[in-house]
């Protein structure tokens, strides 16, 4: 029996499609899934003043802040990806997000706040945030503001998959916004088919389809949330290296990984790295990524791993829908 569950979280909705026995009571499973995403939101939301993230952001420099083990796990992976990407993925962009009007503080850019945030955002998180995993504490060595929006939703999807595994469910697709993870195949053995959204602002259309089996996928782009400044489209994703929003011709970037947390963070990193540095980074780190670039009024594909047109065919493919 195909079971479809969903609920609210993080300003959007989570969903799970799973194949279960006909006599399965969905209520305990749905409650456990909701509790899992609610816990991530309570710990890591920049929109909730009482979250553990905001408690860390309010803490004075050099003070040691006790944090939940789950959040420290996400922070540790965020810092590792920040290091591997040379700061392209940087969770220390919270002040920039707020200054440009994409956070909880304001809904439009503020020139003075942008200048101040730029002065305090030059040191990436992997150089200015220390974690003591054994003691369960974090310590800021600079006045940075952490934002985990580029990794927390992916982690929430992984948490949903962990719940499904706890309930001995072997065939499922968990989703939260543009982050999805397949647990096994469908019950009939077919992979899960996931539509890739075309990055055209103002409309919902399908660019292609990805087939997933025991894999996660995440997409980042400039087409959902952006501001127009001087006629230029500036995405809500921040480039901490420039202390400014991402500004390149990447319309969207889709990444496959074993965990949704990694897919989410690497999609952000490759969006920031852009078409000049992103492909080399993807090849160096063995990432599987599909870029959609805006070139002379059309979308151009560029890929790595199984998305590389020169690569041999793999179970995960992209194609135009019929």
Descriptions of predicted regions:
Residues 1-322:
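Mature catalytic core of soluble alpha/beta enzymes
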């Amino acid at each position: 029996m195909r079971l479809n569950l969903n609920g609210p979280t993080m300003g959007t909705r989570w969903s799970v499609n799973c194949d279960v026995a006909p006599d399965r009571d969905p209520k305990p499973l749905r409650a456990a899934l909701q509790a899992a995403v609610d816990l991530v939101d309570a710990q890591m939301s920049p929109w909730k003043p009482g979250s553990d993230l905001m408690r860390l952001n309010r803490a004075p420099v050099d003070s040691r802040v006790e944090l939940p083990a789950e959040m420290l796990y996400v922070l540790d992976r965020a810092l590792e990806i920040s290091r591997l990407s040379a700061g392209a993925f940087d969770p220390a962009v919270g002040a920039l997000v707020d200054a440009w009007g994409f956070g909880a503080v304001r809904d439009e850019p503020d020139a003075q706040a942008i200048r101040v945030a730029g002065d305090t955002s030059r040191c990436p998180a992997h150089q200015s945030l220390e974690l003591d995993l054994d003691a369960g504490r974090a310590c800021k060595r600079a006045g940075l503001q952490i934002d985990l929006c580029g990794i927390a939703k992916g982690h929430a999807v992984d948490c949903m998959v962990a719940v499904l595994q706890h309930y001995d469910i072997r065939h499922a697709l968990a989703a939260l916004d543009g982050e999805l993870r397949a647990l096994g195949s469908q019950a009939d053995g077919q992979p899960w088919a996931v539509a890739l959204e075309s990055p055209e602002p103002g409309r919902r259309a399908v660019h292609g389809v990805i087939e997933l089996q025991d894999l996660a996928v995440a997409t980042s782009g400039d087409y959902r949330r952006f501001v127009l400044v001087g006629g230029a489209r500036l995405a809500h994703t921040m480039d901490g290296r420039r202390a400014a929003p991402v500004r390149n011709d990447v319309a969207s970037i889709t990444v496959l990984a074993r965990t949704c947390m990694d897919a989410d963070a690497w999609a952000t990193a490759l969006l920031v790295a852009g078409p000049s540095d992103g492909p080399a980074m993807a090849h160096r780190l063995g990432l599987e990524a599909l870029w959609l670039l805006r070139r002379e009024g059309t979308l151009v594909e560029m890929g790595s791993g199984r998305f590389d047109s020169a690569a041999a065919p793999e179970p995960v493919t992209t194609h135009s829908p019929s």
